Amino acid sequence: MNKTVSDFTVKLIGNNTVTADLASMVLNQTSTITGDGSLHLTSKRFFGLDMESASVTIDNTSLFVKGGYGIAGYIGAKSEVLTVRNSYVEAEGSGSGSISLISDLILEDCAITQPVGAEFDADQKAVVLNGELLKSKVVIEPITNSIGTVTADVPARKQGIYNLNGVKLTLQWNDLPAGIYIVDGVKRVKN
């Protein structure tokens, strides 16, 4: 697809589907798949997403891949690195691995959630479960490790400073230790 264009970006708008007999998408240079939409790649016999000597970043989007190989590099070369950043990814490679033949899998603000216990094995250059190459569906999902936005319509009698357990505190803001509090219905962090 992009043999001569490095830093290639696929921006997803809406729901997109590519179905092919061979590879659904081939990326030969450093590439990013991003956007508010989603992408469904299905290969009837070969690669869903072929990272041929390329590093690929899946950034803040949703990607669904199925094929004989799900998401795969060509030979697991050092340049074939898959980065998943705050994205939802489903990959299934019924013949040769769901996520395979890559030198590294970098997960930023996300984790492999299905199957439980699955992990990237650098020696096998693939996502495995109990040391076995996975050919069934692998799911990578965004993780949250903090409080997002707290929205509340706080009546006057409920205003004040609360801890995360919902207990109203009697100390003033300046007297509180460092931590996360809800002040008049708004999340505040005190350092």
Regions inferred by a protein language model and the residue ranges of each:
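A composition-driven surface/loop motif
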Residues: 1-144
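C-terminal outer-membrane/trafficking sorting elements
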Residues: 144-191
